[in-house]
A protein has these predicted regions:
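Membrane-embedded alpha-helical bundles of multi-pass transporters/translocases
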Residues: 2-336
């Protein structure tokens, strides 16, 4: 009976396959996270010749997540279509990101160097549009889980699948691109690398829409049965319409919400910096002198050491709650 979709006791429960498939939306967004946030700064500097502007724009846009996330969340809350509340945002977000990647990595380099002002403008606009699509999908991941299940006993299981989905999307791209990029290196007559494959748009502009399409399809299958109005309210209750002014009032006066927004934006910014290819090239290539030999082993070790923390944090959350788990393991991470 634990795999039934809903119960008469008012608790909304998900089937196992739904818990497994829906977090693949997180994996889908992480494919783009690696593709854009890890490589766009280097691409903007080496191919578009935008210098530090590319890195600066990426950093500023991550800070702006604290503003765009609640706005799109409010828009999602007021949306209800014949195709559901969440699926339209997933599909639209995926299309926006796919088009943005193609425009950024394939079309934008076609703008001649004599029109550098146009490159700056188009780079900013395209990247901003990509951020909107990215926020569409990440907001679905957070909001959709409340529709999928409100059973406290299923939340730890959802957390496990969500983490696996996130690691699949990010890990596959982080592992695959360095292996493939050697085929796109431009060498001189002596065999030395003149242009790194990381600076070649062909490396990732084709494989990403395919990967994201598969991930979104599986995600839609996971939530399709639950993306209906009777699951939008707690226990299937009818929701009241919330005015936009009420959202602003909550943001203005709710101090815990403000802290959450700042913390969320800060975590995203830190992750974007830590996984940026420019930073990793400086660390493993310049400081340690051997990027190709060090990057993949260090990345794999990072995932290996993350697994015990993940399992322990889930266990602590089940016993003492998510707040206690977060405080404990963030403290351990800071000490380490």
């Amino acid at each position: 009976m634990s795999n039934t979709t809903a119960k008469n006791d008012g608790v909304n429960r998900a089937k196992l396959y739904q818990l497994a498939l829906f977090p693949l939306n997180n994996g889908a967004t992480n494919v783009y996270f690696v593709l854009i946030l890890s490589y766009v700064a280097q691409f903007g500097s080496s191919i578009l010749q935008l210098g530090l502007y590319a890195s600066l724009m990426v950093t500023i846009m991550r800070i702006c997540d604290a503003i765009t996330d609640p706005i799109i969340g409010a828009l999602m809350d007021r949306t209800s279509t014949r195709w559901g509340k969440f699926r339209p945002f997933m599909v639209i977000g995926s299309v926006i990101m796919a088009i943005s990647v193609i425009c950024l990595y394939i079309l934008l380099p076609l703008v001649p160097e004599t029109m550098m002002a146009m490159r700056y403008i188009l780079f900013t606009l395209i990247y901003f549009v990509w951020v909107i699509g990215y926020t569409f999908q990440t907001s679905v991941t957070r909001a959709g889980q409340t529709v999928l299940t409100n059973d406290p006993n299923q939340r730890p299981m959802f957390t496990i699948f969500n983490t696996i989905g996130s690691m699949l999307g990010m890990g596959v791209m982080q592992f695959l691109i360095p292996l493939i990029k050697n085929a796109y290196n431009i060498l001189d007559e002596s065999g030395a690398v003149v242009v790194s494959g990381y600076a070649r748009p062909e490396l990732y502009a084709i494989i990403t829409p395919i990967g994201i399409g598969v991930s979104v399809l599986l995600t839609i299958l996971g939530i399709a049965e639950k993306d209906r109005p009777e699951y939008y309210g707690i226990g299937g209750s009818k929701q009241e319409k919330v005015k936009l002014s009420e959202y602003m009032e909550i943001i203005r006066n709710n101090k815990p919400m403000k802290r959450l927004m700042v913390a969320g934006a800060g975590c995203k910014l830190a992750l974007a910096i830590a996984t940026n290819t420019t930073v990793l090239l400086a660390l493993y290539g310049i400081l340690m002198g051997n990027y190709d030999s060090l990057y993949l082993p260090m990345m794999i070790l990072g995932y290996v050491f993350a697994v015990p923390f993940f399992l322990l944090s889930v266990r602590t959350s089940q016993k003492k709650g998510q707040k206690a788990s977060l405080q404990k393991y963030v403290g351990i991470a800071l000490v380490c």
